[in-house]
């Protein structure tokens, strides 16, 4: 498979190279460097003549240092200009770098980004990369303001990542924020206003079709049920009156608002003599399309760099953010009561006041009422500070010591009012809870660099040794009170918890997570032509037993700069040609602490407290995880071959990589039998293999004085296989969206990929000819496969029919097969940038080809289950019907004639079933961003003492070309583990955003 991918990409490379060469032959204009951010971030080497200025080499940030890009031996990718039009860092990265996948779990402010480098290697573990911000490791970068980011480096292979050892199996993303470099004062101000709208809606039954469907459902249950229905809505002949009833669009009411957002940022940089500082402020205000959903965030940042002498300097970085989120979102992880979107699709479009016990018989709840009754406010504060001191006693040696802290405090206030699932469990009385979470990280790092061959002309040797200590602390406290008076609002309940019935508090101080590390790197280069590098890191983690704590992670890499050979050195068309190879190991220890020893916990509610003589007494119980003293690191060995090519002074650049990763000792959560007294056990079992091909192209197609056209393209092919599951051949996993009705809807199997969907194959529906009809009862003919056991009821003409895979005549668990795969065949991005005089236009696309989506909404919205009065998807308008023209149950002959043109089975069934009809192709091409800008001429800005003024208009998520029938193909909720991806169930819909902005440099 790898060879096939390589052949395809070679063809693409040849075509692109020929096309670019033809373009360069007719366009040899100069490329002027005007990117202030590049000048500020890294130093660059230039070659100059009277008319041309080309970037030949640049410094890029690597682990614990910097390196010239030309002598890198690892698979590193850089993004030097993050679009200021984006307010979210993760969305700015989507599709920009080959092999870096950024998928949003859902839309809205509460949607989480799933970031993986080269697809990830763990099955039930964490595949997220390690984030480093200005040298400090952080859990995520979602709270970083885009306006403060200067450069992002993505490290993919072991040559680049092994220096970070135990935390780098998922890759490393290094973020460098803006600093002051040039002399004097520089000030920039950015302002953006915009709005978002919800444009893609799912159709449900009209009031008339809904009334007819409810009538049929009632008629099929019993005469009593039908009589109850007709007493409220009328007889069959009277249902025609609902044709004139206006559609009550619950989705439109819930998501019908235009969301408004605003972003303001101010950046000041100043340098004089040997002191430089930067101060930044960013404010983001976002009101989502969901009623009551909004967020606000303040960011402050400061950097001071002072050179005391040529021997001593220090660097101080500090940042603070405050973020407030209001609204509970769509609650995809909660009960059906709280799933806003689910209720908006299923809730009755007609008046229900006269329907007895409507919410119970329909299992639906008024989405607006529940949304208003479910109060959530989350306040999060984060602070980070680190101080670095660098001592350079001689030119070939330096020592740097860094000490830093990172803290986060988050308070989540919840109040569940009347009608929410939590209130219904307690007599429909309001309840409130306050959860306080505290996290802190202390880090100390000491590194020494030695350059023993610095004065030699052709030989270069750099040595790095270092040690690092990281200590993380975490604690939480949750207080809860129930049975508040209904007249109290959410704020009053939370401010007066004693007015309810206080419950036993739930608090814990989690075990410290400590990593102690020693590392080193040696890099040798001969004549900048032959480069060799070796790294080694030893990590000791407190998450494992004392004899399992140490992990060792070496790497070796080499590069041959072919372009520096004499026979190519003077070919002006080739500006760079480098062949790279690397092999090495990284680790993953992202599991909870103390899984290796017995843990006791205190129950968090009254149901788990002993009652003795009317008094509640707390007690301890064993945790849900059985201790495993043999637990240790998950280790990934990475192999990478890469080729870097540059032509015509790097106006055409190509990066091509082939890689193969193998992961052993997978940290796998295994389920234990009930008799063990535990639920799970974390074990080192199994292995995976991850291989793929990546291609990146950057072409300056046209580069004239008043017109420029640049193209950036990347594509990545990834194939992941399970090599072992620790002695078993397969293992079923559950997404859990339907509770216990649908289990084992994903399967892990040796020799296959992760993300395979496991269910039944749709085989149409039963017809009248499949049955004998005796005394009003349908009896399945001999030899016809029966779904009755699976569907939890008698089958009849029109019932869903599933394929009998083993030929035993009965549909059961043994007939489940793989019906989908969430893993895409390839992903990529395309950016087109134009500049015409002072106008600039940028169009940015990204795509996913292949990869199925598990459309759980489709199952629920076309199945009555055991309930009544549910609205259904418009897909059922052509379904099988049991009624004749007079509203009575049709005879077999009438039924066959009426349903001759039916388009699907009857949705009247007693349970949900996961079958292939609900698995859809999730391929898409998205126009993620379209921006048109205009920069005022300098002759205008000079008069008002401004360096630069640019105005722009942009649109995000403007178009998405896909065959997927749901709201959006880029969705993945119910992600309990990496083994159950791409489930679409009641996810927050993605909106289209339009923004107008102003950028001013003083």
Where does each model-flagged region fall?
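Repeated loop/turn-to-beta-strand initiation elements of outer-membrane beta-barrel proteins
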Residues: 274-277, 311-314, 396-399, 456, ...
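Surface-exposed loop/interface segments of Gram-negative outer-membrane beta-barrel transport/assembly proteins
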Residues: 182-248, 288-382, 400-516, 564-637, ...
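Transmembrane beta-strand segments that form the barrel wall of outer-membrane beta-barrel proteins
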Residues: 191, 281-287, 532-541, 583
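Conserved C-terminal beta-signal and adjacent last beta-strands/turns
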Residues: 710, 821-849, 914-961, 987-1002
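Short secondary-structure subsegments characteristic of cysteine-rich extracellular domains
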Residues: 295-307, 549-559, 947-959
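Residues on the lipid-exposed face of transmembrane beta-strands in outer-membrane beta-barrel proteins
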Residues: 177, 266-270, 302-306, 385-391, ...
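Extended, hydrophobic alpha-helical segments in both membrane/secreted and soluble proteins
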Residues: 149, 300-302, 401, 444, ...
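Short, small/polar-rich motifs associated with maturation and membrane association
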Residues: 2-301, 306-308, 313-315, 319-321, ...
């Amino acid at each position: 498979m790898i060879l096939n991918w390589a052949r395809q990409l070679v063809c693409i490379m040849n075509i692109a190279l020929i096309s670019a060469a033809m373009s360069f032959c007719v366009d040899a204009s100069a490329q002027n460097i005007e990117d202030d951010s590049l000048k500020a971030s890294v130093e660059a080497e230039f070659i100059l003549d009277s008319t041309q200025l080309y970037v030949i080499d640049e410094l890029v940030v690597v682990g614990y240092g910097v390196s010239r890009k030309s002598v890198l031996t690892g698979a590193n990718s850089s993004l030097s200009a993050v679009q200021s039009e984006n307010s979210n860092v993760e969305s700015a990265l989507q599709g920009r770098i080959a092999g870096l996948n950024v998928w949003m779990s859902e839309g809205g402010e509460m949607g989480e980004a799933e970031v993986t480098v080269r697809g990830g290697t763990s099955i039930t573990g964490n595949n997220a990369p390690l984030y480093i911000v200005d040298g400090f490791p952080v859990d995520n970068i979602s709270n970083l303001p885009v306006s403060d980011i200067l450069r992002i480096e993505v490290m993919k292979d072991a040559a680049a990542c092994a220096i970070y050892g135990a935390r780098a199996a998922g890759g490393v993303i290094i973020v460098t924020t803006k600093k002051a470099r040039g002399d004097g004062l520089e000030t920039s101000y950015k302002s953006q206003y915009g709005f978002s709208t919800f444009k893609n809606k799912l159709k449900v039954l009209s009031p008339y079709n809904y009334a007819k469907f409810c009538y049929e459902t009632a008629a099929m249950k019993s005469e009593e049920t039908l009589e109850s229905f007709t007493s409220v809505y009328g007889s069959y002949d009277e249902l025609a009156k609902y044709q004139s009833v206006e559609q009550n669009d619950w989705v439109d009411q819930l998501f019908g608002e235009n969301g408004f957002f605003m972003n303001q940022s101010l950046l000041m940089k100043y340098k004089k003599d040997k002191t430089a500082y930067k101060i930044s402020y960013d404010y983001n205000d976002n009101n989502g399309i969901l009623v009551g959903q909004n967020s606000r965030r303040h960011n402050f940042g400061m950097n001071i760099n002072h050179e005391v002498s040529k021997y001593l300097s220090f660097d101080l970085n500090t940042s603070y953010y405050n973020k407030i989120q209001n609204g509970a979102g769509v609650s995809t992880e909660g009960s059906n009561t709280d799933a806003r979107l689910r209720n908006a699709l299923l809730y009755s479009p007609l008046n229900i006041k006269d329907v007895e016990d409507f919410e119970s018989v329909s299992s639906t709840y008024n989405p607006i009422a529940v949304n208003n009754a479910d109060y959530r406010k989350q306040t999060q504060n984060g602070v980070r500070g680190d101080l670095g001191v660098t001592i350079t006693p001689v030119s070939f040696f330096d020592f740097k010591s860094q000490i830093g802290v990172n803290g986060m405090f988050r308070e989540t206030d919840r109040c569940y009012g009347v009608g929410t699932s939590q209130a219904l469990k307690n007599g429909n009385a309001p309840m409130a809870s306050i959860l306080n979470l505290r996290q802190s990280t202390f880090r100390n790092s000491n590194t020494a660099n030695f350059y023993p061959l610095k004065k030699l002309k052709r030989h270069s040797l750099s040595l790095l040794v270092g040690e690092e200590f990281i200590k993380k602390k975490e604690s939480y406290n949750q207080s809860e009170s129930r049975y508040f008076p209904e007249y109290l609002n959410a704020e009053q309940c939370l401010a007066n918890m004693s007015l309810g019935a206080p419950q036993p508090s739930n608090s814990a101080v989690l075990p410290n997570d400590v990593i102690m590390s020693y590392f080193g790197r040696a890099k040798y280069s001969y004549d900048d032509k032959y480069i060799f590098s070796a790294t080694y890191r030893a990590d000791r983690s407190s998450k494992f037993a004392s004899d399992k704590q140490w992990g060792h992670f070496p790497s070796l890499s080499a590069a041959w700069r072919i372009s520096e050979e004499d026979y190519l050195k003077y070919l002006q068309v080739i500006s760079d040609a480098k062949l790279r190879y690397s092999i090495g190991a990284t680790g993953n220890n992202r599991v909870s602490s103390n899984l290796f020893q017995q843990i006791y916990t205190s129950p968090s509610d009254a149901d788990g407290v002993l009652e003795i003589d009317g008094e509640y007494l707390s007690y301890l119980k064993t945790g849900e995880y059985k201790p495993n003293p043999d637990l240790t690191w998950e280790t990934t060995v990475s192999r990478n071959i890469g080729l870097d090519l540059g032509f015509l002074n790097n106006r055409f650049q190509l990066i091509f990589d082939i890689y193969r990763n193998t992961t052993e000792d997978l940290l796998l959560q295994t389920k234990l039998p009930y008799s063990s007294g535990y639920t799970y056990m974390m074990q080192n079992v199994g292995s995976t293999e991850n291989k793929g091909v990546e291609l990146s192209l950057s072409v300056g197609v046209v580069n004239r004085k008043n017109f420029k056209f640049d193209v950036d393209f990347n594509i990545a092919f990834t194939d992941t296989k399970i090599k072992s599951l620790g002695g078993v051949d397969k293992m079923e996993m559950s997404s859990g969206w339907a509770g216990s009705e649908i289990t084992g809807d994903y399967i892990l199997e040796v020799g296959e990929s992760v993300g395979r969907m496991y269910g039944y194959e749709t085989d149409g529906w039963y017809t009248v000819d499949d049955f004998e009809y005796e005394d009003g009862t349908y009896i399945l003919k001999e030899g016809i496969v029966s779904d009755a056991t699976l569907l939890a009821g008698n089958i009849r003409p029109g019932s869903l029919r599933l394929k009998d895979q083993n030929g035993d005549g009965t549909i059961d668990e043994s007939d489940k097969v793989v019906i989908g795969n969430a893993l895409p065949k390839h992903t990529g991005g395309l950016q087109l940038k134009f500049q015409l005089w002072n106008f600039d236009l940028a169009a940015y696309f990204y795509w996913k080809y292949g990869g199925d989506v598990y459309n759980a909404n489709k199952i629920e919205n076309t199945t009555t289950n055991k309930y009544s009065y549910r609205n259904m998807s418009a897909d059922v308008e052509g379904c099988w019907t049991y009624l004749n023209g007079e509203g009575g149950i049709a005879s077999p002959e009438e039924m066959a004639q009426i349903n001759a043109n039916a388009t699907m089975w009857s949705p009247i069934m007693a349970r949900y079933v996961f079958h292939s009809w609900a698995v859809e192709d999730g391929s898409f091409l998205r126009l993620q961003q379209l921006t048109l800008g205009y920069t005022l001429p300098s002759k205008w800005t000079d008069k008002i003492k401004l360096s630069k003024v640019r105005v722009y208009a942009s649109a995000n998520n403007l178009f998405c070309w896909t065959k997927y029938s749901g709201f959006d193909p880029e969705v993945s909720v119910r992600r309990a583990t990496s083994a159950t991806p791409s489930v679409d169930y009641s996810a927050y819909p993605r909106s289209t955003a339009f923004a107008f902005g102003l950028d001013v440099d003083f």
